[in-house]
Amino acid sequence: MTAARRGRRNRPPRVVLDTNVLLSALVFSGGALARLQGLWQSGAIVPLVSTTTAEELVRVLAYPKFKLDPGARQELLADHLPWAEVVEIASPPPPVPACRDPFDLPFLYLAASGRAEALVTGDADLLSIADGKARTVRSFVIVRPHDFLASLAGA
């Protein structure tokens, strides 16, 4: 994502953060991606969610490996969902590039339906659509988290 793309619209970029990126930002607050939480809470980015992607986040936060009690899960959701814009996915969903993993389709549908500027992911199947580079697919780029953060810092 270039500064020119953001500047043209003169508004914060609309972004889809896949579940693993969100987990890194929320659960691992000392991690490299914790900065994302400050970005959405300050209005520097607009995270997009759909019913399907929000349900996946709720389900994954309940995995035993995270050792999060219901109260902790609610707190983490409260650190994200109030800042997210809910996007309704049409039926049938919009056309998106072919993807090897059908579980990744909700993120592609969300990016296309929500007019996202970026789909931020470390997922190999999603990145393979863009040949592992930040490259525009339809109207949005599929980009690694660190590259996305660098693009914001360079703006």
Kindly label every feature range from the protein language model.
Residues 39, 110, 134:
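Hydrophobic/aromatic ligand-binding patch that stacks against planar heteroaromatic rings
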Residues 83-119, 124, 128:
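Active-site neighborhoods of divalent-metal-dependent phosphate/nucleic-acid chemistry enzymes
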